[in-house]
Amino acid sequence: MNPLIQSLTEGQLRTDIPSFRPGDTVRVHAKVVEGSRERIQIFEGVVISRKSQGISEMYTVRKISSGIGVERTFPIHTPRVEKIEVVRHGKVRRAKLYYLRALQGKAARIKEIRR
């Protein structure tokens, strides 16, 4: 990578990110701006993918809300995310869990592991 680009991105990388992988259940505290005020909205779900590396790294979280699947994609190093909590670790054998979109109910459960 170009040394100039690398020096610019190093200052913007966050160090308070816990280690999590696809299959883990996370609680994301995201800042939401509504008009002139700002509040924190918690989005809890299963991580179904992690993409890229460095400053452009992203992850997708999926949850079921009122029987409808909702997915949100967040950049790892964004200041819009207050914090990320790992609720539990799941045992999966894939890097991308897009097959969970077709499953519902008990079939969409992920076995928990101790880490």
Curated annotation (Swiss-Prot):
S-S bonds: none
GO molecular function, one term: structural constituent of ribosome
A single GO cellular-component term on record: cytosolic large ribosomal subunit
Record-linked InterPro entries: Ribosomal_bL19 (IPR001857), Ribosomal_bL19_CS (IPR018257), Ribosomal_bL19_sf (IPR038657), Translation_prot_SH3-like_sf (IPR008991)
Keywords annotated in UniProt: Ribonucleoprotein, Ribosomal protein
A biological process term (GO) from this entry: translation
Record's function text: This protein is located at the 30S-50S ribosomal subunit interface and may play a role in the structure and function of the aminoacyl-tRNA binding site.
NCBIfam families named in the record: rplS_bact
HAMAP family in alphabetical order: Ribosomal_bL19
Family affiliation: Belongs to the bacterial ribosomal protein bL19 family.
Identification of the protein by name: Large ribosomal subunit protein bL19
